[in-house]
């Protein structure tokens, strides 16, 4: 993966479209250079470990929001494909995390990215509410 391309994408949506990313969630595995690069530019990086304890509640909420059609993804075919490729691992404590299904070569990266975004939302929910003028979007 070319992390420079990812950084360029974040800068492009900020500079060209005035979309300001308050937090960027990331999996710490093999991303040290990119994390430092993004911090130097001014992005607030939030580490999200890809384990059941970390991802369980956000993943369950994402599932509920997808069912309730609260997630707008414009029927993106790549994200839809990644979501369809994603299966659930459940531990003995009923915590869940995403895994690849039977097709081990299939990609789940888009689904995992969305779950990471939900993990950041869970961690920074009060900041999100403040950005919305003190109330949740669906109130």
Language-model-detected regions and their locations in the chain:
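Active-site proximal helix-loop segment of RNase H-like, two-metal nucleases, encompassing DDE(D)
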Residues: 62-70
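RNase H-like, metal-dependent nuclease domains and their acidic two-metal-ion catalytic environment used
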Residues: 1-50, 60, 73, 77-139
């Amino acid at each position: 993966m070319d992390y420079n391309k990812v950084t360029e994408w974040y800068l492009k949506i900020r500079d060209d479209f005035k979309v300001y990313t308050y937090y960027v969630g990331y999996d710490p595995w093999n991303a040290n250079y990119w994390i430092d690069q993004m911090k130097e530019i001014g992005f607030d990086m939030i580490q999200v470990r890809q384990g059941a304890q970390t991802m369980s509640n956000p993943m369950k909420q994402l599932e509920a929001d997808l069912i309730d059609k609260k997630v707008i993804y414009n029927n993106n075919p790549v994200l839809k494909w990644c979501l369809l490729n994603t299966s659930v691992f459940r531990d003995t404590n009923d915590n869940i995390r995403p895994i690849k299904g039977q097709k081990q070569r299939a990609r789940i990266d888009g689904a995992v990215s969305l779950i990471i975004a939900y993990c950041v939302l869970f961690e920074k929910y009060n900041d999100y509410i403040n950005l919305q003028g003190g109330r949740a979007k669906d109130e």
